[in-house]
Structure formats: structure tokens, C-alpha cells
């Protein structure tokens, strides 16, 4: 988990997530650095929009409350269902990417 936390810390500080930066954060925290994990983390996060991933990770709580809201017209329901299906597909893709990260850290 320390590796992911290091990446999140770098991201929140506005720093680039590179092998050297991740190593520096881990070393500053007193963690024994595993070069393979650092390389795998940086490679896995390449092209990932971290802000979007964080936002979507927090989304299921908000989505669960949505069905309790007012009833929608049938046409609106069809649009919402299509939108929800698209969102679910995106979530599945992100979950697969996150699972790939989980495999790296055992």
C-alpha cells in the first residue's frame, strides 16, 4: 500500500509520478524500496487520470441514493439506463485496471 500512497501523495502535491519521485517518497518514509514494484506502479499509472479514478471510486455512495429520488418519465428512464450502462462499463474498465495494480502488491 505504501507504493500507492506514495503515488497519491505525489499527485496531490502536483509532482510527476516517476520512479525517482516514488523512490524518494518511500525512502523518506523509511520504507525499503522494491525496484520492481516501483517500476510496475509507474507503468500501471501511465495514462491514468488519477482525479477521475478517485472521483469514480467515491461515486457508488452517491449512485446508491439516486434511485430513492423522484420517479422519472419512461423516456428519461431509458436515457438514464443507457447512461448507467455506459458508466458501469467505464467502472468495470477502471476496476480491471485497479485489480491489475492489486496483483502487483499481493
UniProtKB/Swiss-Prot annotation:
Keywords: Ribonucleoprotein, Ribosomal protein. GO terms for molecular function: structural constituent of ribosome. GO terms for cellular component: ribonucleoprotein complex; ribosome. InterPro entries: P1/P2_N_sf, Ribosomal_P1/P2, Ribosomal_P1_arc. One of its GO terms (biological process) is translational elongation. Transmembrane segments: none annotated. Residues 69-106 are annotated as: Disordered. Residues 83-98 have a biased composition (Acidic residues). Forms part of the ribosomal stalk, playing a central role in the interaction of the ribosome with GTP-bound translation factors. Belongs to the eukaryotic ribosomal protein P1/P2 family. Part of the 50S ribosomal subunit. Homodimer, it forms part of the ribosomal stalk which helps the ribosome interact with GTP-bound translation factors. Forms a heptameric uL10/P0(P1)2(P1)2(P1)2 complex, where uL10/P0 forms an elongated spine to which the P1 dimers bind in a sequential fashion. This is Large ribosomal subunit protein P1. The gene is rpl12.
